[in-house]
């Protein structure tokens, strides 16, 4: 996922 829930891209 993009930046939104943790701050990193997965």
Swiss-Prot record:
Keywords, comma-separated and alphabetical: Decarboxylase, GTP-binding, Lyase, Manganese, Metal-binding, Nucleotide-binding
Necessary cofactors: Mn(2+)
Family membership: Belongs to the phosphoenolpyruvate carboxykinase [GTP] family.
The UniProt record lists the keyword Methyltransferase: no
The keyword Metal-binding belongs to this UniProt entry's keyword annotation: yes
Domain of life: Eukaryota
GO molecular function, one term: metal ion binding
Enzyme class: lyase
Cofactor note: Binds 1 Mn(2+) ion per subunit.
EC number: 4.1.1.32
Upper taxonomic lineage: Eukaryota, Metazoa, Spiralia, Lophotrochozoa, Platyhelminthes
Protein name per Swiss-Prot or TrEMBL: Putative phosphoenolpyruvate carboxykinase [GTP]
Catalytic activity: oxaloacetate + GTP = phosphoenolpyruvate + GDP + CO2
Complex formation: Monomer.
Described function: Catalyzes the conversion of oxaloacetate (OAA) to phosphoenolpyruvate (PEP), the rate-limiting step in the metabolic pathway that produces glucose from lactate and other precursors derived from the citric acid cycle.
